[in-house]
Amino acid sequence: MSLFLDTARIEVKAGKGGDGAVAFRREKYVPDGGPAGGDGGKGGSVIFKVDEGMSTLMDFRYNRIFRGKPGEKGMNKGMHGRGAEDLIVHVPQGTTVKDNETGDVLVDLIEKDQEFVVAKGGRGGRGNIRFATPRNPAPEVAENGEPGEDKILLLELRVLADVGLVGFPSVGKSTLLSVVSNARPKIGAYHFTTITPNIGMVQVGYGDSFVMADMPGLIEGAHSGAGLGIQFLRHIERTRVLLHILDMSELEGRDPYEDYKTINDELESYNLRLMERPQLIVANKMDMPEAAERLAEFKEKLAADLEADQEMPEIFEVSGLIKTGLQGLLARTSELLAQTPEFLLYDEDALGDEVAYYGFEDEEKPFKVSRDDDGGWRLSGEKIEKLFIMTNFDHDESVMKFARQMRAFGVDETLRSMGAKDGDYVRIQKFEFEFVD
């Protein structure tokens, strides 16, 4: 089983805030002690942090749920509960975090030690010391802690490389990477020897270096899933220069020009501006007897197919096996990197409109009303459900406060207008009460 994993679906659940306390100060010589219930502590958030030592999402294969700790409950004498420590989850550099339901990109973690809160911990509930008023100096009211955020996330890893090697299987990409860098990829005389991206550091002269990535071989239909498909096409997205490796020998019986067109069609079909990147054609295996003749045929076909305003692409003749022609290729690659800015990983359509429009909008109604199969009424909605969860039903004053808040929301009026009658059951989550007209 491969130890390389570049996608993972996980659940993150931030910690619940601590419950506020209902307490009263009872001490000698303090006749008017009053309320003394402290607030609950904040729940622990779940935070992703870039770890340069990680190179795969393998840690998420079996560990798929990450829970933050709850905050401590409030205490007597006005003492607040301790906030929970945040849960730090380490991820590889180059991890993109998406909302699994909407597909929206939440963050692209590419900087060293970069952190991002993926699930925020819940606020601590207020103790009864917060609810004291001149009319009610000793309230028996406190809040439960706010639930922490709960999300399903999709993680996608894209390797951080400056240069990407693309081409059909067995054209010599891994061999080329092994002789120009410190990488030691698996090399074999069969297709798909490379099944995971290999990365190597290439030194060009003094102090000049770049990262090169050898991608698993592409085949026709890769953009729609053929072969290893888009599983590894995503890793090309962060590169700034592409080296298109072509096999000029007759060993595989392939037509270099058809291979060239097919691979470029796949890159274009993937639709991530890959064809906008500078691309150098690398005519590999030029040590073979028939290579020069096949290269001449390739150049003829390429020239005949160019548009009138198109320039002939740069072609470098190399042999990864006997290490010829490599210095010129690496020097030109380094020049292109110096001239080419980074490409945005996501286009405007993927990230949405960047222009913000401000204006008045109708406030979202705090609740919705529906009917259950047995004829009962069900209240739902983020605001009213959050209010319900944070209400401490162990104290009558808290229950009365909840009833007042529901009336302020317009729940009674809405139920009445929809035909609710005395004695009808009204439900919020698993709680049930009777409607009183």
Curated annotation (Swiss-Prot):
The Obg domain, residue ranges: 2-160
Binding-site residues for GTP, renumbered to this chain: 167-174, 192-196, 214-217, 284-287, 319-321
EC main group: hydrolase
Cofactor(s) listed in the protein's UniProt record: Mg(2+)
Database matches in PANTHER family: DEVELOPMENTALLY REGULATED GTP-BINDING PROTEIN-RELATED (PTHR11702), MITOCHONDRIAL RIBOSOME-ASSOCIATED GTPASE 2 (PTHR11702:SF31)
MF terms in GO: GTP binding; GTPase activity; magnesium ion binding
Keyword Nucleotide-binding: yes
GO cellular component: cytoplasm
The keyword GTP-binding is annotated on this UniProt entry: yes
Biological role stated in the UniProt entry: An essential GTPase which binds GTP, GDP and possibly (p)ppGpp with moderate affinity, with high nucleotide exchange rates and a fairly low GTP hydrolysis rate. Plays a role in control of the cell cycle, stress response, ribosome biogenesis and in those bacteria that undergo differentiation, in morphogenesis control.
Domain OBG-type G: 161-338
Domain OCT: 359-437
Protein name: GTPase Obg
Entry-linked Pfam families: DUF1967, GTP1_OBG, MMR_HSR1
Subcellular location: Cytoplasm
Subunit text: Monomer.
Taxonomic source organism: Lactococcus lactis subsp. cremoris (strain SK11)
Record-linked SUPFAM superfamilies: Obg GTP-binding protein C-terminal domain, Obg GTP-binding protein N-terminal domain, P-loop containing nucleoside triphosphate hydrolases
Residues noted as binding Mg(2+) in the record, renumbered to the chain: S174, T194
GO biological process: ribosome biogenesis
Similarity-based family: Belongs to the TRAFAC class OBG-HflX-like GTPase superfamily. OBG GTPase family.
Keywords carried by this UniProt record: Cytoplasm, GTP-binding, Hydrolase, Magnesium, Metal-binding, Nucleotide-binding
EC number(s) stated in the UniProt entry for this protein: 3.6.5.-
Domain of life: Bacteria
